[in-house]
């Protein structure tokens, strides 16, 4: 036979679980009902055709500090643009959206991945021969075009669209 203390413990625990579940369910309902849903396409009669093939995006996060005010640089402790000159890619995501638009796959490319960087023309007009280096060097040396060419050549995946968020954009988003 169970002791009265055990029965009391089980009763209190059961009531607490039921009460917690009820409050959670009610809270979820309040949050769900407070979300404003908008049909952004209502009233638009002429729209472009839906894409009929898969699409690939390269999303790059850059550490460029261009565009930050002196006050923002001081507040965020980023150093000056002279100290952190140039642009390096901190984050690279290759996003594939399926033909039917029912699936998306995202691959994060580590910035220190060793890759064959194709030949490029530097800012002084000198042609540099292909070389092995960290993949984010492609972005620092030749910007988006060289990074795209590097990723396409190493992955054999065509990149259809390019999105870059620099440090200034990141700060303003957050």
Enumerate the predicted regions with their spans.
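Non-catalytic, solvent-exposed segments at the cell envelope interface
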Residues: 1-173
